[in-house]
């Protein structure tokens, strides 16, 4: 998926305080921008020069190459 598309989807989810799942061919990473939702991870950085997004996880950080993303599912609260 293109970096600009990923960033647009996630920034829209953030402004609407939504949550969802980023799916790659071998991994799913949950995220949440909902206030007070501590059960899921949060997107913390977009790096345009490498086209990677960083997700702060419970046990470790995830770094996802945008080209590896197959789908992003976004859900309303």
Residues of each region from the PLM?
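Short acidic, Gly/Pro-enriched loop/turn segments at secondary-structure junctions
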Residues: 61, 73-77
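Intrinsically disordered, low-complexity boundary segments flanking structured domains
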Residues: 8-9, 16-18, 41-42, 59
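Short amphipathic beta-strand and strand-loop transition segments with alternating hydrophobic
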Residues: 11, 43-45, 74
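A short beta-strand micro-motif
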Residues: 4, 18-24
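A short, compositionally biased
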Residues: 12-19, 47-51
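Charged, amphipathic alpha-helical segments
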Residues: 1-12, 36-40
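Acidic, low-complexity, intrinsically disordered interaction modules
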Residues: 24-68
């Amino acid at each position: 998926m293109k970096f600009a598309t990923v960033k647009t989807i996630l920034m829209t989810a953030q402004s609407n305080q939504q949550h969802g799942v980023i799916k790659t061919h071998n991994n799913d990473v949950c995220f949440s921008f909902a206030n007070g939702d501590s059960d899921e991870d949060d997107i913390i950085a977009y790096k345009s020069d490498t086209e990677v997004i960083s997700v702060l996880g419970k046990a470790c950080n995830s770094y996802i190459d945008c080209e590896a993303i197959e789908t992003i599912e976004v859900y309303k609260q």
